[in-house]
Amino acid sequence: MEALSGRVGVKCGRWNPTAEQVKVLTELFRAGLRTPSTEQIQRISTHLSAFGKVESKNVFYWFQNHKARERHHHKKRRRGASSPDSGSNDDDGRAAAHEGDADLVLQPPESKREARSYGHHHRLMTCYVRDVVETEAMWERPTREVETLELFPLKSYDLEVDKVRYVRGGGGEQCREISFFDVAAGRDPPLELRLCSFGL
């Protein structure tokens, strides 16, 4: 039993992040990362493992908890701002600056101890934040084709022309033909499935 007493968190299985892990996560959160993707969580947890034991689920829940705390803090501040005896607060200005997308620069270290590891963290965070911003720019709006299926087809296939689906294409083309069934083998499907595009 004495061998276990020196190790923190072994018995209960709870994750106790090191100061370095908390610092990295906090810097990412302040830089605007709120809901990291699975790939981002994996990369973050891989980096954090250099500072101590961590699992991907720990990183996921850390961000969930901090988003909830931030929402709670904003609600609390809004309630306080609506009361007649509350004045403006310096924290309000700092929080507003963090809410904008332009605030992606990490804050410089405040103590000598922080300054020692700042160079490494600053380079890592700057690259990571740039990567996150570029990745999120690609997520904006995926292009999709709008297709309408006939729910209850009223006719069977009489002509080979009817066995082709038309899909509205992007760019300059109106529609393109895509072979839908194996016409050469002469096999007809039990249902007619036709995808029609309407000018939307």
Curated annotation (Swiss-Prot):
Its main location: nucleus. CDD domains: homeodomain (cd00086). Specifically expressed in the central cells of the quiescent center (QC) of the root. The gene is WOX9. It is found in: Nucleus. This is WUSCHEL-related homeobox 9. Transcription factor which may be involved in the specification and maintenance of the stem cells (QC cells) in the root apical meristem (RAM). Transmembrane segments: none annotated. It comes from Oryza sativa subsp. japonica (Rice). The keyword Nucleus applies. The lineage of its organism: Eukaryota, Viridiplantae, Streptophyta, Embryophyta, Tracheophyta. Gene3D superfamilies: Homeodomain-like (1.10.10.60). Coiled coil: none annotated. One of its GO terms (molecular function) is DNA binding.
